[in-house]
Amino acid sequence: MKWRLLRTGHKSGAWNMAVDEAIMVHVAKKAVPPTFRLYGWAPPALSLGRLQSFERDINPDGCRRLGVDVVRRPTGGRAVLHDNEVTYSFIISEDDPMLPSDLRDSFYLATEGIVKGLAFLGIEAEIRGRQGGGGSLADAYRSELRTRPGADGSVQSGACFDSPSWYEVVAADKKLVGSAQARLSGVFLQHGSILITMDTDKMCQVLKFEDPADRDRAQAQLLDKATSIEAILRRAVSFREVEEAVIAGVREHIKPIELVEGELLPEELSCAEDLMSQKYAADSWTKRR
């Protein structure tokens, strides 16, 4: 059995999301095998969860000032600032015998290879379960919470990396990889961010807060709850180094399945172009909530 590996480089947020959905369309048609893709973002982009409120959570003036695009994902969860990171996506048919029916078990299938890849970099990471978490896709979509002071004085922001999920990839007791899932037309998608560096100030400038004090508290929470590869290793790390390590980890995890490097089909590229222009680059999608 063979799965496809794609390395598609640094592209715009609208293009990246369009490609993920285009691959889903063609996996549904059985035109392509299960696909593991690695990519980056140029320019940096803020991605919203599918059901997240643009008006409530996003600061468009801050995004424009910092040169940050805004795009809405097909997956749930909260906002992620995609800048210096390696992003992965894993796409497989729901009827594939390799895909568990349980949502949390499917997270493990898609993520354990990344944990192994981090080990090749010298990072001891683990998948840590959240107690009491539900297993339905609706539960994932309920994670978009209004920015407000919590009972303990904390701030619940629109940021992914200050919020819990059922299973998190953590290192040094902090969240290192943020992921989200979707199921569409019989196809499973999981994509996520592997942070090389983390700019909490920039993240908090592109999100909306009621006052500066809330922004300061949210930034402190991000520093407390999230980390990055360079923060752990205390050295400069390149996109390519992380990419190669993750590929090695995924290959080890899925043995005896072979991960074969390939390219997007012309039909996938055409589909992605249509999805980008009609959906992911359109305000009707990005600002629909």
Predicted regions and their residues:
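Short loop/turn segments at secondary-structure transitions that flank enzyme active sites
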Residues: P44, F54, G76, E94, ...
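Active-site loop/lid in soluble adenylation, ligation, and acyl-transfer enzymes
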Residues: M1-D57, D61-R65, D69-R73, R142, ...
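Surface-exposed acidic/polar loop and edge beta-strand patches at domain peripheries
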Residues: L46-D61, V71, A79, E85-I92, ...
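Short connector loops at helix/strand junctions that flank enzyme active sites
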Residues: W41-P43, R65, L81-E85, P164, ...
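Short glycine/serine/threonine-biased micro-segments
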Residues: S47, R65, P74-T75, L81-H82, ...
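N-terminal catalytic or cofactor-binding beta/alpha core of small enzyme domains
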Residues: K29-K30, R73-P74, I92, S101-L103, ...
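Catalytic beta-strand/loop module used to bind and position nucleotide/cofactor moieties
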Residues: M98-E252, D283, R289
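Residues forming anionic-ligand binding surfaces in small-molecule and nucleic-acid pockets
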Residues: P74, R78-P97, D216-E230
